C-alpha cells in the first residue's frame, strides 16, 4: 500500500507541475498578444492553427504564423480595460485544453480555447479556437 500511495503522490505532483506549466504557457500568450511576437512564437507550436470570427468575419482562420505576423505589425491590441483570466485547464497525459476569457481585446470580449500538447517534454499550444462573445462595454 505504501508504494501505491507513493505512486499516486508522484502522479499528483506531476499533474500539479503540468498545470503550472500550461498556466505559464497561456501567460506567454497573454503577454505576447499585445505585440511581443517572441513570446507568441515560444508559446505556439510551429504548425499550430487558429480559427475564429468576429461577427460575420472569419478574421482569424489559418496558420498561427499569420496571427503572429499580424500582432507584430499591429501591436497594442489590448484596450485600456484589458483583462485575461484562465478559466480552466484540463490535462490527460501529454494532451489537454485551456480556456482563456479576455475582455477589451480589439474592442471585443473573447473566450479562447487552446489545445495544448507536450512535445519533446515541452508544452505548446497546437490550436487556438476563439469565440467573440460581445463588444467591450466602456466603464460607467
Short names for language-model regions:
Residues 1, 109-137:
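Short beta-strand edge/turn micro-motifs at domain boundaries
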Residues 55-58, 62, 130-140:
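Short, charge- and proline-biased low-complexity linear segments
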Residues 40, 87-89, 115:
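Short secondary-structure boundary/capping segments
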Residues 17-21, 49-108:
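Surface-exposed, charged secondary-structure patches
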Residues 33, 44-45, 102-104, 129-132:
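Short beta-strand segments enriched in hydrophobic/aromatic residues
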Residues 77-78, 83-88, 124-125, 132-140:
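Low-complexity, flexible helical/coil segments
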Residues 1-46, 136, 140:
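Short, low-complexity N-terminal intrinsically disordered segments enriched in polar/charged residues
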Amino acid at each position: 500500500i505504501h508504494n501505491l500511495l507513493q505512486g499516486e503522490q508522484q502522479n499528483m505532483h506531476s499533474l500539479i507541475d503540468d498545470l503550472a506549466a500550461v498556466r505559464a504557457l497561456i501567460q506567454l500568450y497573454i503577454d505576447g498578444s499585445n505585440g511581443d511576437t517572441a513570446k507568441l512564437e515560444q508559446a505556439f507550436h510551429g504548425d499550430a492553427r487558429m480559427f475564429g470570427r468576429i461577427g460575420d468575419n472569419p478574421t482569424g482562420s489559418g496558420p498561427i504564423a499569420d496571427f503572429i505576423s499580424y500582432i507584430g505589425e499591429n501591436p497594442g491590441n489590448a484596450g485600456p480595460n484589458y483583462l485575461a483570466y484562465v478559466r480552466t485547464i484540463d490535462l490527460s497525459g501529454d494532451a489537454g485544453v485551456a480556456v482563456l476569457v479576455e475582455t477589451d481585446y480589439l474592442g471585443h470580449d473573447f473566450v479562447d480555447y487552446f489545445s495544448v500538447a507536450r512535445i519533446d517534454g515541452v508544452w505548446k499550444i497546437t490550436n487556438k479556437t476563439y469565440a467573440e462573445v460581445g463588444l467591450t462595454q466602456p466603464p460607467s
